[in-house]
UniProtKB/Swiss-Prot annotation:
Catalysed reactions, as listed in the record: a fatty acyl-[ACP] + phosphate = an acyl phosphate + holo-[ACP]
EC numbers for this chain: 2.3.1.274
Family membership noted in the UniProt record: Belongs to the PlsX family.
Stretch forming the signal peptide: none
General function of this protein: Catalyzes the reversible formation of acyl-phosphate (acyl-PO(4)) from acyl-[acyl-carrier-protein] (acyl-ACP). This enzyme utilizes acyl-ACP as fatty acyl donor, but not acyl-CoA.
The keyword Cytoplasm belongs to this UniProt entry's keyword annotation: yes
SUPFAM superfamilies to which the protein is assigned, alphabetical: Isocitrate/Isopropylmalate dehydrogenase-like
Keyword Cytoplasm: yes
Chain's gene name: plsX
Localization terms from the record: Cytoplasm
Cysteines paired by S-S bonds: none
CC per GO annotation: cytoplasm
Enzyme class name: transferase
Full protein name: Phosphate acyltransferase
Amino acid sequence: MKIVIDAMGGDHAPFVTVEGAVEAVKNYDIHIILTGNQPLIENELVKYDYPKERIEVIHCSEQITNEDKPVISIRRKKDSSMVVGLKLVKEKKADAIISAGNSGALLAGGLLVLGRIKGIDRPALAPVYPTAKGISVLVDAGANAECKPRNLLEFGIMGSIYAEKVLEIKNPKVCTVNIGIEEEKGTELVKEAYQLCKEGPFNFQGNVEAREIPNGYADVIVCDGFTGNVILKLTEGLASSIFSLLKEEFLKNTFTKIGALLLKPGLKSFKKKLDYTEYGGAPLLGVKGVLIKAHGSSDGKAIKNAVGQAIKFMDNKVLEHISEGVSSLGDDEFE
């Protein structure tokens, strides 16, 4: 199994991408291909002890930055670490790609280079969402700001398969995000999607309100990418604010400091549950290849976990299951 890591993608590349690659080959029986600036990558690799025959470096003369325009950069920067990596997957020279680089460019590259699975109109970004009951998956988290009702049906199919096959959630509950649980509430998009999802090949449980999402009411949270991205960013910001406020309160006096020491194990466990590095990255579901988008500020641990995520994705044949799930509806649903 060969996995490409875009060594130049992310806020701390190539330091953390190389670190993650090294940890990955130590923990998994795989071959890693690092794409990017070869001298910089090799300068990092010499710092580690690892099975050298299992990490390959492919030099790329270009790099896509966060300032680059997504579609233009994919089309013009043919020798960038991201595009070269995507082409390796497209040409079956690699089985998956992981990148912490420019999100828009990676999503565009997924569509332009890898292409869509037959029957999928809109691929979707599907990050893990930590809840009080464990984890859920949020589909879509930003790939599609505007959607049609059938797109939400697609998201339900893909999210349900991913939740069951990779996250190991048995018979996952799928819900559409709405301002109320009643079937007649919401925008036309959500109301029409509700009717489609009722007949979908998954365990549809109706609408979920935003306040119930953190409680784990739904295993698969379905919404358009605009709504999903707002939910994701709000949750990230809220979690950060809560920890900052707790720290401020715990440092007020001797008694609160003692309390903090007593609560430290529980708080550490809670913080770990909310830590995105534990989950690797977010797959772009619906493209003809395994593509994992890692967080821009990922560390080596997150990159290593993204590799593990990609392995599980392939071992459980998620792409094949998505293709089968969509085809069961009939082609006329997606014309």
